Amino acid sequence: MDARDIILRPVVTEKSMNLMDDKKYTFDVLVSATKTQVRNAVEEIFDVKVKNVNIMNVRGKEKRVGRYTGKTARRRKAIVTLTEDSNDIKIFNDNKEN
């Protein structure tokens, strides 16, 4: 499986942005992905060294539209901690157009 198939998208919330100061990056990953697969994918895509990987499963929430109920999709989040000597991961472009 390709590394870009495992890492779906970065999670951009206030909490995850604060964790970036401690070299912890949060990603939505494939529901069937393991810690080892996430570690190898992050190291391959971003060219960094991973110290630790924590994974959590997020259940889908029930949503209603009128009288019809449904559920949002379940997902899996991975918090990846980088080593101290690793470079930071650039999630956002720093290009500013004037």
From Swiss-Prot:
Q: Which GO terms describe its cellular component?
A: ribonucleoprotein complex; ribosome
Q: Does the keyword RNA-binding apply?
A: yes
Any keyword Iron-sulfur?
Answer: no
Output the Pfam families linked to this UniProt entry: Ribosomal_L23 (PF00276)
Which Gene3D superfamilies does this UniProt record tie to the protein?
3.30.70.330
Q: Which UniProt keywords apply?
A: Ribonucleoprotein, Ribosomal protein, RNA-binding, rRNA-binding
One GO term in the molecular function aspect is:
structural constituent of ribosome
Q: Which GO terms describe its biological process?
A: translation
Q: Which InterPro entries would you find in this protein's record?
A: Nucleotide-bd_a/b_plait_sf, Ribosomal_uL23-like, Ribosomal_uL23/eL15/eS24_sf, Ribosomal_uL23_CS
Cite the NCBIfam families for this sequence: PRK05738.2-4
Q: Give the matching PANTHER family.
A: 60S RIBOSOMAL PROTEIN L23A
The UniProt subunit note reads as follows: Part of the 50S ribosomal subunit. Contacts protein L29, and trigger factor when it is bound to the ribosome.
Q: What does this protein do?
A: One of the early assembly proteins it binds 23S rRNA. One of the proteins that surrounds the polypeptide exit tunnel on the outside of the ribosome. Forms the main docking site for trigger factor binding to the ribosome.
Q: Which family would the database say this protein is a member of?
A: Belongs to the universal ribosomal protein uL23 family.
Recorded protein name is Large ribosomal subunit protein uL23
